[in-house]
UniProtKB/Swiss-Prot annotation:
UniProt keyword Zinc-finger present: no
Gene that this sequence comes from: pgk
Enzyme class, spelled out: transferase
Positions that bind substrate: D23, L24, N25, R38, H61, F62, G63, R64, R120, R153
UniProt subunit comment: Monomer.
UniProt-recorded name of the protein: Phosphoglycerate kinase
GO CC entries: cytosol
Binding residue positions for ATP: K203, E325, G355, G356, D357, T358
Length: 400
């Protein structure tokens, strides 16, 4: 990964106006933030800049307002939570450009923190419109991007600003990039990837990229059924994309060419209905009843997955192994996650995980603090796993 500048490269920023792109796209119900994780992740960058005397000006999007103001998507509603997390007063401007923003910035003292209104209230944000970028840049001397989760978008506040102002990575961005470099950029081998989830169709690029980079690819979740069916296994009524059999075969051929082992379930936990406490049984993967569906990988498969994790120096994980939301179909995901956490805590494994369902599954297993790094970035994490260039990251390595 090319070098990029971080906050460590910033000298004497007292009095400087620092535009900080953060991810504050948090879930809100009845006007209250229900999960402040994303705010907590960017707090260190904000507070470090403030403590050094910078005038910290926060840029963020919230929801999809489609280029015009929508009251329910105003960032004003999250100000109290941001203040609670930072333990620091913040002011709010009713626009991210124009007089409201300029006036609010002009009133700032050194160390103050200002949140500007939702950047997506303007069409220029998602279009990366040069005129809009210039209006944003007018309020800053320095640009810091701490929103890896939005780095796959070439928007005005994530990519355009880095062309106008000296650009640096914030602490969250820095930690994410360093963790991802350990995961797939320059990993210690052997590297094992676990990919689960419902559908192959949403992860074709990811799987094709991984088989060229990892030593073993463990496939679980509903997508394993598509690979099993492509191999000639009868998967009963299991979720399966039969029309992607040829794609699955191509991925397996590419894996063989690249020297990547494909690890598929040897047994499964099957049920006739997908409900909590449904009657279920463990069957060999070649003996799935015609009227049943596989909802989790079985204990023999779990032991195999744990053995692969034990052999690995690096683990990259995206997607659960089974329908973890409903017991007892969470057993395999929990067992594998706990084993990976134990190996990580023992200093034997670098473990990097990401993706919405993955984060939820690892939280469910109670091990989210025990992995080397868990990305909350969603789409950006997936595009990184697919081997795609992320505009918001690429510009940091070439910015003036």
């Amino acid at each position: 990964m090319p070098a990029f500048k971080t906050i460590d490269d910033l000298n004497d920023i007292a009095g400087k106006r620092v535009l900080v792109r953060v991810d504050l796209n948090v879930p809100v119900a009845d006007g209250k933030v229900t999960d402040a994780t994303r705010i907590e992740r960017v707090a260190p960058t904000i507070l470090e800049l403030s403590s050094k005397g910078a005038k910290v000006i926060l840029l963020a999007h919230f929801g999809r307002p489609k280029g015009e103001p929508v009251a329910e998507m105003s960032l004003s509603q999250i100000v109290p939570t941001v203040e609670d997390v930072l333990d620091h007063a913040i002011s709010f401007a009713t626009d991210c450009i124009g007089a409201p923003a300029a006036d609010a910035v002009a009133k700032m003292n050194d160390g103050d923190i200002l949140l500007l209104e939702n950047t997506r209230f303007h069409k220029g944000e998602e279009k990366n419109d040069p005129a809009f970028v210039e209006e944003l840049a007018a309020n800053g001397d320095i640009y810091v991007n701490d929103a890896f989760s939005a780095a796959h978008r070439a928007h005005a506040s994530t990519e355009g600003l880095a062309r106008h102002l000296p650009a640096y990575a914030g602490r969250t961005m820095q930690a994410e990039l360093e963790a991802l470099e350990k995961g797939l950029g320059q990993p210690v081998r052997p590297v094992v990837a676990i990919v689960g989830g419902a559908k192959v169709s949403s992860k074709i690029d990811l799987l094709m990229n991984l088989v060229k980079k990892v030593d073993a690819l463990v496939i679980g979740g509903g997508m394993a059924n598509t690979f099993l069916a492509a191999r000639g296994t009868n998967v009963g009524k299991s979720l399966c994309e039969h029309d992607l059999a040829e794609t699955a075969k191509q991925i397996m051929i590419e894996a063989a060419t690249s020297g990547c082992a494909i690890v598929l379930p040897e047994d499964g936990v099957v049920a006739r209905e997908f409900t909590a406490g449904a009657a279920n049984e463990i069957v060999d993967i070649n003996a799935i009843p015609a009227d049943a569906m596989v909802l989790d990988v079985g204990p023999k498969s779990v032991e195999s997955i744990k053995a692969w994790i034990s052999r690995a120096e690096t683990l990259v994980w995206n997607g659960p192994l089974g329908a973890f939301e409903i017991e007892p179909f969470d057993a395999a995901t929990v067992a594998a996650a706990k084993h990976a956490a134990e190996c990580t805590k023992a200093g034997k494994l670098v473990s990097v995980a990401g993706g919405g369902d993955t984060v939820a599954a690892l939280n469910h297993a109670g091990v989210s603090d025990d992995f080397t790094y868990i990305s909350t970035a969603g789409g950006a994490f997936l595009e990184w796993m697919e081997g795609k260039e992320l505009p918001g990251v690429a510009i940091l390595t070439t910015a003036k």
